[in-house]
Amino acid sequence: MVNIRNIERSEVEEVSKLEAICFPEAERASFARIKDRVKRAPEIQLGLFAPTQHTSTLIGHVLTSRTGSETVTHESMSKHDSKGENIAIHSLSIHPAHRKNGYAKKLIEELQFRCQHTITPKPSRMILISHKPLVPFYESLGFKNLGPSECKFGDETWYDMTHKI
């Protein structure tokens, strides 16, 4: 049985390694960026852990920040506004060996639950950018597609997505 909990500072290297497995270099968060997010907003950085014989192993994560922006911007990716009314999802990663088990959905649902019940101040919405093939997945979780994003990473077109809480 998997466990979702906040990522600890001591786990940043493990998170960075998973990020490197899951994203091409142009799209992944740097070690420094991950470390900064975990330091500034540990309550909204979630890890998905699978039990092993003596401990647990990180198999997924969702990395976020707070922002006043209603869509993800380059600025919102590099800053955390502790008073921001929105949660910007920057990375949803599941190790390739553990995909197709509903774990990405579990992470988003847990983040949404925490946004509704434990995170203060309570956010208004979750926002993210997505590649076109993943838009239907996020729509199935209640996100609305706002169309092509102004954010550019690599050669792909990204789509702004929003989910009111």
Swiss-Prot record:
SUPFAM superfamilies: Acyl-CoA N-acyltransferases (Nat). It is an enzyme of class 2 (transferase). The keyword Transferase applies. Pfam families: Acetyltransf_10. This is Uncharacterized N-acetyltransferase C9.02c. One of its GO terms (molecular function) is aralkylamine N-acetyltransferase activity. Belongs to the acetyltransferase family. One of its GO terms (cellular component) is cytoplasm. It comes from the Eukaryota. Residues 2-165 form the N-acetyltransferase domain. It comes from Schizosaccharomyces pombe (strain 972 / ATCC 24843). InterPro entries: Acyl_CoA_acyltransferase, GNAT_dom, SNAT-like. The keyword Acyltransferase applies. Keywords: Acyltransferase, Transferase. Its EC number is 2.3.1.-. Gene3D superfamilies: 3.40.630.30. CDD domains: NAT_SF.
